[in-house]
Swiss-Prot record:
Protein name (Swiss-Prot/TrEMBL): UDP-N-acetylmuramoyl-L-alanyl-D-glutamate--2,6-diaminopimelate ligase
Functional description taken from the UniProt entry: Catalyzes the addition of meso-diaminopimelic acid to the nucleotide precursor UDP-N-acetylmuramoyl-L-alanyl-D-glutamate (UMAG) in the biosynthesis of bacterial cell-wall peptidoglycan.
Name of the coding gene: murE
Subcellular location: Cytoplasm
Organism in which the protein naturally occurs: Clostridium perfringens (strain 13 / Type A)
UniProt entry keywords in alphabetical sequence: ATP-binding, Cell cycle, Cell division, Cell shape, Cell wall biogenesis/degradation, Cytoplasm, Ligase, Magnesium, Nucleotide-binding, Peptidoglycan synthesis
Span of the annotated motif Meso-diaminopimelate recognition motif: 405-408
Source taxon at top rank: Bacteria
Known pathway: Cell wall biogenesis; peptidoglycan biosynthesis
Cross-referenced NCBIfam families: murE (TIGR01085), PRK00139.1-2 (NF001124), PRK00139.1-4 (NF001126)
InterPro entries xref list: Folylpolyglutamate_synth_CS (IPR018109), Mur-like_cat_sf (IPR036565), Mur_ligase_C (IPR004101), Mur_ligase_C_dom_sf (IPR036615), Mur_ligase_cen (IPR013221), Mur_ligase_N (IPR000713), MurE/MurF_N (IPR035911), UDP-N-AcMur-Glu-dNH2Pim_ligase (IPR005761)
Residues where N6-carboxylysine is found: K219
Length: 484
């Protein structure tokens, strides 16, 4: 491809060489460079791509995209831009033929509820006959074909490659979980969203964003790029988003939803039980919906999805069908149901204070005897939420078993000490080994008890200091039942 074509839509300066030169591929990782590639020198938080220019040239890079002043002796084309992250996004889109413009893209942001919402919308669109792609935490999907996900939102190059694969496969809609990292790091730069949904905002990722204001502003970027913004007005930050959209002159149509406050679309006559909820919403007339996942927070997730589908003119019967039939891996997932155990086991991805409170409150409401929770906190992540999660776990559970999650580079016991140090409860026990913690919960469970294993959900691995091991909690439960 001609370099000039890749640079379309960018403000740039040719420092050296020729913009009519040919480029084989675009790379932002110097380890992947091949002969004739363009190397985009992305400035990261730990490493700076500009430091690897010499290595990139040795491997065959013929073009450098930089934002710093650089000098090289070789016959290399150098293009200077203001921001190489934004440049990577635009160039990647151009390289793959701008597939984003051939898809209707729906973005979902918020601390919790992104995955559930994405799966609900995908289910609704597929019931309506649309081939749908999904990009998210659990995996990426091209229709029914599953592609493993490395991060919630891929880097811009991989994202546009995925868009191209979707377009080639006949996908019409793409539903995306849009993380605060991806918005802040410009992975989704240049993408215009058909619909942007806000689920909620609670403390998370402050190890990255540093302040809550930064976290909020990162999330807000989605609505600056959405044709239609759908906002949860019951969340304390929902009203802020609506206000900021107006005050900042953002060109987006706004719809609000709620259970408590007055909004454009309010759920009422709610009936909740252990298998899900039924509720009504006044759209063009009063409509009744049901979802087979319990918890008030899943009614909120459903509302955003219903409005999204309604805006897209999806037939009402297909919206209802997609909502009632949706299955979400690792979200309030009942495990070993066919074993007819005297107690129940639920696996859930809850890994934030708000997420843990939601799942435990929901399960507690339908637990006949005791609720036993098993949870920990991730290493190399925001430490402030550790005692918060300990307090929530002990307050809501009859017995809390505090264990390891993904400790990463930290010592598991150091993380556990952060969780339990301020606790003034006597209903918790510590078991560092996560499998043994699950075994302990199952061994102590009595008839009518419910065990909630929180934190990993769909994940099939555990990240330790020196290695990542296979760890699927469904398999662990069955292994324990078989005496392993």
């Amino acid at each position: 491809m001609i370099l000039k074509s890749l640079l379309k839509g960018l403000d740039y300066e040719v420092i050296k060489g020729n913009e009519e030169s040919k480029v084989q591929n675009i790379r932002y990782d110097n380890r992947k460079i091949e002969q004739g590639d363009a190397f985009v020198c992305v400035k990261g938080f730990k490493v700076d791509g500009h430091s690897f220019i010499g290595d990139a040239i040795k491997k065959g890079a013929k073009t450098l995209i930089v934002q710093e002043d650089v000098s090289v002796q070789e016959d290399i084309t150098i293009i200077k831009v203001r921001d190489t992250r934004k440049a990577l996004a635009i160039m990647s889109s151009n390289y793959f033929g701008n597939p984003k413009d051939k898809l209707k893209i729906i973005g979902i942001t918020g601390t919790n509820g992104k995955t559930t919402s994405a799966f609900i919308i995908k289910s609704i669109l597929e019931k309506a006959g649309f081939m749908t792609g999904l990009i998210g935490t659990i995996a990426n999907y091209i229709g029914n074909k599953k592609v493993d996900a490395v991060r919630t939102t891929p880097e811009s190059y991989e994202l546009h490659e995925l868009f191209k694969n979707m377009v080639d496969a006949g996908v019409e809609y793409c539903v995306m979980e849009v993380s605060s990292h991806s918005l802040e790091l410009d992975r989704v730069y240049g993408i215009q969203f058909e619909e942007g949904i806000f689920t909620n905002l609670t403390r998370d990722h402050l190890d990255f964003h540093k302040t809550f204001e930064n976290y909020y502003n990162a999330k807000f970027k989605l609505f600056e790029r959405s044709n239609h913004s759908i906002i949860n007005l019951d969340d304390p930050y929902g009203a802020n988003i609506v206000k900021d959209i107006e005050e900042r002159g953002v060109k987006t149509k706004v719809s609000t939803f709620s259970i408590e406050k007055e909004s454009d679309f309010k759920a009422f006559e709610i009936k909740s039980h252990s298998n899900g909820s039924e509720f009504k919403v006044n759209l063009e007339g009063i409509e009744e919906f049901s979802i087979n996942i319990p918890g008030e927070y899943n009614i909120y997730n459903s509302l955003g999805c219903i409005i999204c589908a309604y805006n897209l003119n999806i037939p009402m019967d297909k919206i209802k069908e997609g909502l009632s039939d949706v299955v979400i891996p690792g979200r309030c997932e009942l495990v070993a149901k066919e074993k007819n155990l005297p107690y129940s086991i639920i696996i859930d991805y809850a890994h934030t204070p708000d997420g843990l409170e939601n799942i435990l409150s929901t399960v507690k409401a339908f637990t006949k005897n005791r609720m036993i929770s098993v949870f920990g906190c991730g290493g190399d992540r925001d430490k402030v939420k550790r005692p918060q999660m300990g307090k929530i776990g002990c307050e809501l559970s009859d017995i809390a078993i505090i264990t390891s999650d993904n400790p990463r580079s930290e010592e598991p016991m150091d993380i556990i000490n952060d969780i339990v140090k301020p606790l003034n409860y006597d209903n918790f026990v510590i078991e560092v080994n996560r499998k043994e913690a699950i075994r302990k919960a199952m061994n102590m469970a009595l008839e009518g008890d419910v065990i909630v294993i929180a934190g990993k959900g769909h994940e099939t691995y555990q990240i330790l200091k020196d290695e990542t091991i296979h760890f699927d909690e469904r398999e662990v439960v069955y292994d324990i039942l078989e005496g392993k």
